[in-house]
Amino acid sequence: MKIQQIRNATIRIECAGKHFLIDPWFQKKGTGMSAPSPDPEKAKTPSPTTELPFPVEQIMEGIDAMIVTHIHPDHFDPETAAMLDKSIPVFAVNEETKSQIEGFGYTSVMVLKDEGTDFDGVVLIRTEAMHGESPDQAAGPVCGIILQAAEEPVLYVAGDTVYYKGVERALEQYRPDVVVLNARGAELMGLGRLIMGAEDVLNVCEAAPNATIIASHMDAVNHATVTRAELRDFLRKHGKDGHVLIPEDGECLEFSGM
């Protein structure tokens, strides 16, 4: 299995010979949204705050399917949707998102299922996620995903979520070998924290002591509250720096089969 950090929450996954792209967001630096951060200076800064590490054509080379955990401007936006081959299979969190993606012109859109979908030997399982600190404040429908395949590590991509009972259930049920966390700790005016921050990552370390944890969704949007450097420092102080990998954009990690 290979996991390549592209930018933000966009990652490439190679599993059992299949190549998946999660949450493609290909806008150029400074041409997207300026999210309403509580920090007035950050609120003025347009996202993305970094460029892609590679050309879009290189990122998309060999991709067999895309997975969209939710429709937000920093996960799958209309500009990115217009760039890509509309015949590529796409897995969506729910029927509403499926319809939105079909509205972009995509012709092979499927809904992820809690019971799993077999995609050429790789089973994709939808998991719970909560995109905010409470159900009332959650920023729309979102999911995580489990990838399972013969002789491969079990991978859990938690998606845009805080640490809560739903994440605990996924960790307990699937016992993943590798866990990808969106860990920038973003905040929006009036909504509070949207995804995991440093303390949440520490909670996952304690809940999944035998898993390799990867921190993604870092250093690319204006409303982030945790940087890679800050997360590394926090984990070092808590003795967990050897438990969590924090890849730079473009970096590829490889894991042996189980």
Model-assigned labels for residue ranges:
Residues 5-16, 118-177, 196:
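Catalytic core of the metallo-beta-lactamase
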Residues 162-249:
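Cap/insert and terminal regions of metallo-dependent hydrolase folds
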Residues 22-23, 62-71, 91-94, 155-161, ...:
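Active-site neighborhood of phospho(di)ester-bond hydrolases with catalytic His/Asp-centered motifs
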Residues 1, 85-90, 153-155:
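Short active-site oxyanion
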Residues 18-67, 78-83, 134, 163-173:
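Pre-active-site segment of Zn-dependent metallo-hydrolases
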Residues 31, 47, 53-118:
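Active-site HxH/HxHxD metal-binding segment of metal-dependent hydrolases
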Residues 27-29, 72-76, 98-100, 115-118, ...:
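Active-site environment of divalent metal-dependent phosphoester hydrolases
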Residues 59, 92-152, 233-258:
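Metallo-beta-lactamase
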